[in-house]
């Protein structure tokens, strides 16, 4: 149920997912071992029934189906699963998911944690991950029955609760914390006074500029187009301490769906933007050094921009 980034990282140690994502954001088997679909709308997934939860309960199709339904009711996953019409567990150890519209990439959306059937209200539901909660829930220890137990990088993770960024940075600087997550694009951007070793990993978090299409200027699509070439995305990446990648497309450059040629054609280019504004007759009509537009062909109007940061 957690929405906290740090807690989600802990969950990934305890709970495994139905599918996993490669570095290219393609789906690969997790607790679903294989899947198929003839039309992109009805999908059949095979559950790895050789796996078991930390309490010994063997994973079933009911558990997998319940986990999907639980995710559908969660604000964290509801959007990505919005097209799911029906989830059915079958006696042969498979799960059938029916969508309201075809999506050939649907398995990539199922990297959601798996819990036991009807365990959604439990404070600490059992998982199938490499680590399990200790009896006092203050640490995570290696799950002895996990297939990769002998490959665990550390024997235990000790958990501590901190309620603010200041508390986290102070604990890290004082040596109370060994690991901390920092996201420069959010309120959890951490700055440490001591030397630290940083590791980065790719996400699908997207920072973008949206236009108010109800405004008198931006309601016109051709007026919005030049602004694509005005945004210096590389500069924005630098502001995020290089913890991001620039893309003119709503797709990560590492993804197999990324179109390099199209991305290059939409890259930052002030000269192209100026020409587009000129062609649209968005020019400096009154000599004040600023461009205006003339929707009625008679009176030039100033272009006023108000930027609002929306972090949801």
Which residue stretches match the model-derived regions?
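A structural "hinge/loop" feature
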Residues: 1-11, 31-32, 57, 105-114, ...
